[in-house]
């Protein structure tokens, strides 16, 4: 599959995708000038093995570290959690321990972010493989769960609570981590 931000779209391909949708949707697509139609694919990315440089002086945050599908409804939230966690780690480590802060940031965030990414896959599958006749019979079947672990998390408080133990654990496993 070709990836591009600006690959030209095809009106007939778009109409096929919405085959069973309301006629007004078909009319809107057919009224779109061909040269204005973009085939913008949503592409999944497996989690990176690490978000930090080998010397832990550079850290990726947000979509640069862990791109989310739009169905995750978590991209911006997770980027903010990254930012506040890194800020807490830098504050607590101090200027002389930036590499320790960066490593702690990754360790604190990594597993939570991977789990959050998986929610996007689940939602994507639920929405893209929907039996709309079943939804019509039971509208609640399409409702997404409100996952407290994801939506009610206080990343700043969490970072303050776990930083000391996380930083202490880094001494033994720094050499074992993959490098970027």
Identify the residue ranges that each predicted region occupies.
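FAD-dependent flavoprotein oxygenase/oxidase catalytic domain
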Residues: 1-180
């Amino acid at each position: 599959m070709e990836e591009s931000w600006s690959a030209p779209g095809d009106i007939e391909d778009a109409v096929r995708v919405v085959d069973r949708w309301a006629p007004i949707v078909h009319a809107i697509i057919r009224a779109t000038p061909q040269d204005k139609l973009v085939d913008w694919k949503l592409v999944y990315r497996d989690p990176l093995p690490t978000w930090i440089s080998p010397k832990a002086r550079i850290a990726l945050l947000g979509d640069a570290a862990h791109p989310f599908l739009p169905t995750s409804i978590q991209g911006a939230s997770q980027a903010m959690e990254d930012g506040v966690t890194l800020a807490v780690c830098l504050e607590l480590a101090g200027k002389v321990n930036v590499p320790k802060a960066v490593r702690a940031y990754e360790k604190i965030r990594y597993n939570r972010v991977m789990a959050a990414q998986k929610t996007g896959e689940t939602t994507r599958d639920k929405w893209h493989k929907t039996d709309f006749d079943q939804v019509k019979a039971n509208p609640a079947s399409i409702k997404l769960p409100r996952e407290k672990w994801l939506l009610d998390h206080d990343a700043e408080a969490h970072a303050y609570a776990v930083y000391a133990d996380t930083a202490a654990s880094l001494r033994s496993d720094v050499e074992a981590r993959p490098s970027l």
